[in-house]
Amino acid sequence: MAEIRRQPFQTVKVDIEEMDRKIREHRIRMLKRAGIVLGILILLWFLLYIYHQVRTYDSHEAKVTEDRQDSAANTYLEFQGNILKYSNDGAFYTDTSNELIWNQSYEMSDPVVVMSAKYAAIGDEKGTLVYIFDKDGLCGKIETTKPIVRVKIAEQGTVALLLEENGVSYLKLCDKTGKTLAEGELHVENSGYPMDIALSKDGKQFAVSMLDISDGTIKSSIAFYNFDSAGEKKIDHVVGTKKYSDIIIPQIEFLENDNLIAVSNQKLMLLEVSGKPQEKKSIKYGSRLRTFFYNGKYIGLILDNESSSKEEKNDVYCMQIYDNRGALVKEKTFSRTYRKAEFLNNNEVCLLNDNECTIFTLRGVEKYHEAWDKSIYKVLPGR
């Protein structure tokens, strides 16, 4: 023990630089491994995405079936992930398992439905009633004294109406409870006959397409209204008008970026309305326009196919998809017979015939086609 006590206390000299080097090397190795793993995951995700984009289907498997207890007069729409069914005598809102969420009775001769992300309005064309709903049920009701010609709805539930009586047209703007926000007469002798109306996403901008043939020639115009500060000092809130000769504009729609799309018999026009309305882009059809459809993000045209390409010349139709800036996303020729074309909620294109369904991706891939043994009324994307 004495000898042990006589031994001097010893310390171990630590090489700090060597330890730092080893720590750095370890970190680099771990970062490389993490980078490799991340790269593999990204590659797998990309391959899976491509696989789903190009994968095709020609059949289906029914997981749940439900016999219809209603008549063929009922129309089905998707609304906030559930199903809105409406007819002349009422509306029913159910989940995808057919469990009732709410219902509303009414009497309409020609009901039409317009929807935004959170609200739906059911109006009686040529009648005087409009009901406004959200996912929980009735929000408000509008009763007019003049027949309804058009109904449009904004994101916050604001409803725009085009009314007509004895050859005189009127505009009416209401909030989601049915309270009147603005209304007035359209002077046809000054601007023509109204063809369509459009309401912006925020409900602050409004447009009317007019047709004038009073002097024996065809003239069209689009009048723009602003109910925000930009239109406060303007007469009747009109902030601008675009005029066109020798074309008819039967349909106008606001897109998600608040640009306006005008569908004429000769071309498609994209107008910017944030300031003074001006035309940003014009797309000539090149052949006969068969169908126009849109969903706010994308615009779809189906035209007669006049391609001389060996691979495409035998196809009957040419489908063109544009984004809301007017840029061409995809052009695809096809020969499938259809009676209706629309975008699904996942932006895929659905073509419906009486008992046939065809679905195209935005890449132009025919993802699904099948002929059913029963009539198809509506296709909704699964969750």
Task: Show the residue positions of the predicted features.
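N-terminal Lys/Arg-rich, disordered targeting/topogenic segments
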Residues: M1-L31
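A short beta-strand motif characteristic of beta-propeller blades
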Residues: R55-R68, N98-S105, D136-E143, T180-H187, ...
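Short beta-strand elements that form the blades of beta-propeller/WD-repeat-like
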Residues: N74-S87, A91-F92, V113-E125, V130-Y131, ...
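Structured, soluble extracytoplasmic/luminal domains of envelope-associated proteins
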Residues: I101-E155, Q278-E306, Y317-C318, L328-T333
